[in-house]
């Protein structure tokens, strides 16, 4: 099912029960502090919603299915509950979901054979640019196609358990591999298109899942994907996860940024 919305209440330090279909890091480890300075924590009002990626001091990219009526972002966070020296809070002035994304598929909370969840991408324009520091940095968009077999790293604050919701305070990283799309085509009844990347471990045990939606997938150190959807429970054998393939969207991203300075 879709990696939908995880709500974490910072004021109470509690996590609400998560609906089925969310995304989490499984089989990962605590990221080294400030090792992912482009990682964004996206909030709906005061509740944690999704991950995101800082691609420009004024722009964050995330998944289109991370929809809300109110966006706020935290930058430079490693632990979501601690006061941290590099942490920066920003409001979002505008959101730009990809025009070809089909939001009604997400709202239905169902998955049907042949459903096409392509174009799961959204740009967020910050009301004030981020301050670039040792703990907050932008990451470049890809300029070349990723290679099958590449070593990839995904990160997020999603659940570390595939069925029992257990959400970490600290940012988690997981090392996985980029697979051919044919592996995901065999795994899913939904469409797997050339606008998507297939990544994970066929033996299972390592995956992104609830709460990781919208976060980064770096392959050979290059930002190549945005966490989108996958199996439930996550990290199942022969069921890698799906990521939005950024190289297919660089022209659209640059156009939106240029037209909305």
Curated annotation (Swiss-Prot):
Residues 1-18 form the signal peptide. This is Glandular kallikrein-7, submandibular/renal. SUPFAM superfamilies: Trypsin-like serine proteases. InterPro entries: Peptidase_S1_PA (IPR009003), Peptidase_S1_PA_chymotrypsin (IPR043504), Peptidase_S1A (IPR001314), Trypsin_dom (IPR001254), TRYPSIN_HIS (IPR018114), TRYPSIN_SER (IPR033116). Residues 25-258 form the Peptidase S1 domain. It catalyses: Preferential cleavage of Arg-|-Xaa bonds in small molecule substrates. Highly selective action to release kallidin (lysyl-bradykinin) from kininogen involves hydrolysis of Met-|-Xaa or Leu-|-Xaa. The active site is at 65 (charge relay system), 120 (charge relay system), 213 (charge relay system). It comes from Rattus norvegicus (Rat). Its EC number is 3.4.21.35. Belongs to the peptidase S1 family. Kallikrein subfamily. Residues 19-24 form a propeptide. Disulfide bonds join 31-173, 50-66, 152-219, 184-198, 209-234. Glycans are attached at residue 108. GO terms for molecular function: peptidase activity; serine-type endopeptidase activity. The keyword Disulfide bond applies. Keywords: Disulfide bond, Glycoprotein, Hydrolase, Protease, Serine protease, Signal, Zymogen. One of its GO terms (cellular component) is extracellular space. Pfam families: Trypsin. Kidney and submandibular gland. Not expressed in liver, pancreas, spleen, parotid, testis, cortex, prostate, ovary and pituitary.
